[in-house]
């Protein structure tokens, strides 16, 4: 049985669970639980696998959540599912909380995207205007440097954007082809977990965490659009593209990226998807909304790369020119201000887009984004002013310092073992780009608690700012009086302190998960069982009846697996009863044995895999306690606990 990943986790019936990792690869593993009482080749299962699922329009679920099917009385059937009607109600409540299907594209979302476009145009436009001004005044050296940073950032962004377009376009075509082949009579499209399927070394992964969800959503939508409905009718939108249509798309995208308009095109496409989600009916609204979310996550990542490859060095360059010439022109001031705003905006906007595109993260409010913007604005302002002051006196040593700091930060990022890109060399390039970001500001690249790493980073930044400012003050030019030097130093340290205060405010009052100070990593808010409330009749059921239901389902799944000629991939079994002791009695928990090596998954997918399995199986069995996952390499307890925590 070939494992095909469509990137969805859903509750197909009150006693049916399906999961596939957010990874578009033939090498990716997947998990599927067959509904008790349904043979593996039944028509009901084939209808669900074709894309009907829990979505009325058959669009499939491109989100990592649990939802209940709304057809065929599935909410009220299946006493063995552990709850009948109550189980369906509990699953519906879980779907509303985890899937966030009630979210709509609002006016604030549109204004936020338009503001991002305005910030981008202001940043790039003022840089080009200033470069032309330098050329007209005969300052060819400043003109060359200013234009170089503009071209460097733009070309880098176009390369990344076109690379992502190629990957998305090929993924949609491959998923459409796969779904079409599954629609043939007699085709076996069931998915199971196999250790060999997940252990491939050459697995293809998208470039960033949000792109994993984005590509899964796009391939899922392409696959479900080409699927059959319950009456056997084929959707028109799922047909293969003609050769002329594909050629036109390739030609259009090539021209857009050659003209350096890839980022603008993605912004316009994001607005278009948001408007479509508003105009569509209830059946298709969420599909366009989540496509908009993932597209905005992509363009936010591109904006982030552009700002730190173009705006950050541009800001340091212009401030250094101002300090050296002892004069400030209006255009230079506008350029520096636009670059600083673009840097802070890109960081805050990317964090919002990343959280919005992940179902295992709570969305961040606009007030929290504003606090994040102020945090990054003031810390980056202190950093670049320090760089400008130091570079005005020590040009050579400033270059050595930047290269040394970048090497250390890149080594630190590589040591964190990020797994965001498709190949090893792309991963190295990505780590090198993030190392450039670390020259100016903090950027989280690893799941888990960041308190220690955040403290170390800003402590190092404070030491560097102090040393560079002190060296500038001691060796500054004689014509620079203390009337200018003392206020400059005050601006540096007061700006850094203000940014740290905003950072503490964000984590203390505006973090989506609540206050982050004095909280242990195993608090109740991280427990998947608290994400929804169980029905009363289920909550009062005894552990013995639940255990009996588990054994019946396990025996039935064992019988189906042996009939299909494969060994069951994961087993749900009750643990041995605890030995008598003086400790209070523990609630019996389930152990899910998964025939996979957990460390073969990238960090972000491991987190989503664990969370999704717990939520799905907990809703499936209505157990009073979340089950425990046991991988082949379960000896790495510290690693497993590390990805249980959130930012």
From Swiss-Prot:
Highly expressed in expressed in the brain; weakly expressed in the spleen, thymus, uterus, blood vessels and fetus. Residues 1-44, 197-238 are annotated as: Disordered. It is a multi-pass membrane protein. It comes from the Eukaryota. The modification Phosphoserine is found at residue 197. The chain crosses the membrane at residues 112-132, 142-162, 245-265, 303-323, 328-348, 362-382, 393-415, 425-445, 454-474, 484-504. Coiled coil: none annotated. Belongs to the XK family. This is XK-related protein 4.
């Amino acid at each position: 049985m070939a494992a095909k990943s469509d990137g969805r986790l859903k509750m197909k019936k009150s006693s049916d669970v399906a999961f596939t990792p957010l990874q578009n690869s033939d090498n990716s593993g997947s998990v599927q639980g067959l509904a008790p009482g349904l043979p593996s080749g039944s028509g009901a299962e084939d209808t669900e696998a074709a894309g009907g699922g829990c979505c009325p329009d058959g669009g499939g679920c491109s989100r990592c959540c649990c939802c209940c099917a709304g057809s065929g009385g599935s909410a009220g059937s299946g006493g063995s599912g552990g709850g009948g009607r109550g189980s369906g109600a509990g699953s519906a409540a879980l779907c509303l909380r985890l899937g966030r299907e009630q979210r709509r594209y609002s006016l604030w979302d549109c204004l936020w995207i338009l503001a991002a476009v305005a910030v981008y145009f202001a940043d790039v436009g003022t840089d080009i205007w200033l470069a032309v001004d330098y050329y007209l005044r005969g300052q060819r050296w400043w003109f060359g440097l200013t234009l170089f940073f503009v071209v460097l950032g733009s070309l880098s962004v176009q390369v990344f954007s076109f690379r992502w377009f190629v990957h998305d376009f090929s993924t949609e075509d491959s998923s459409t082809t796969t779904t079409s082949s599954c629609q043939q009579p007699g085709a076996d499209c069931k998915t199971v977990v196999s250790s060999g399927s997940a252990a491939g070394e050459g697995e293809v992964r998208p470039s960033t965490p949000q792109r994993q969800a984005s590509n899964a959503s796009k391939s899922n939508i392409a696959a479900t659009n080409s699927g059959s409905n319950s009456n056997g009718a084929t959707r028109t939108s799922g047909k293969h593209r003609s050769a002329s249509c594909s050629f036109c798309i390739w030609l259009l995208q090539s021209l857009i990226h050659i003209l350096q308009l890839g980022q603008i095109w993605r912004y316009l496409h994001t607005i278009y998807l948001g408007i479509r989600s508003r105009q569509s009916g209830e059946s298709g609204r969420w599909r366009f909304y989540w496509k908009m979310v993932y597209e905005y996550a992509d363009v936010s990542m591109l904006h982030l790369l552009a700002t730190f490859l173009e705006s950050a060095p541009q800001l340091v360059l212009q401030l250094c020119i101002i300090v050296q010439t002892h004069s400030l022109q209006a255009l230079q001031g506008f350029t520096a201000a636009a670059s600083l705003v673009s840097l802070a905006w890109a960081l805050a906007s990317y964090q919002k887009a990343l959280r919005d595109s992940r179902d295992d993260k709570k969305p961040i409010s606009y007030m929290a984004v504003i606090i994040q913007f102020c945090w990054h604005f003031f810390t980056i302002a202190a950093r670049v002013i320090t760089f400008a002051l130091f570079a005005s006196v020590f040009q050579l040593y400033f270059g050595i310092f930047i290269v040394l700091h970048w090497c250390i930060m890149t080594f630190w990022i590589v040591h964190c073992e990020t797994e965001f890109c498709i190949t090893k060399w792309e991963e190295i390039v990505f780590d090198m780009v993030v190392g450039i970001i670390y020259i100016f500001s903090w950027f989280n690249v690893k799941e888990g608690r960041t308190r220690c790493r955040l403290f170390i980073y800003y402590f190092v930044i404070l030491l560097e700012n102090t040393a560079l400012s002190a060296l500038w003050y001691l060796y500054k030019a004689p014509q620079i009086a203390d009337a200018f030097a003392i206020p400059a130093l005050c601006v540096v340290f007061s700006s850094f302190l203000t940014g740290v205060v905003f950072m503490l405010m964000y984590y203390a009052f505006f973090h989506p998960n609540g206050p982050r100070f004095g909280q242990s990593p195993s608090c109740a808010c991280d427990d998947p069982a608290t994400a929804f409330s169980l029905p009363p009749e289920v909550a009062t059921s005894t552990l013995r009846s639940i255990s009996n239901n588990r054994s019946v389902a396990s025996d039935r799944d064992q019988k189906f697996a042996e009939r299909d000629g494969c060994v069951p991939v994961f087993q749900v079994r009750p643990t041995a009863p605890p030995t008598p002791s003086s400790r209070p009695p523990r609630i019996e928990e389930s152990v899910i044995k998964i025939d996979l090596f957990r460390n073969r998954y990238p960090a972000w997918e491991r987190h989503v895999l664990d969370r999704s399995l717990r939520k799905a199986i907990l809703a499936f069995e209505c157990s009073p306690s979340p089950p425990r996952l046991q991988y082949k390499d379960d000896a790495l307890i510290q690693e497993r606990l590390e990805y249980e925590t959130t930012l």
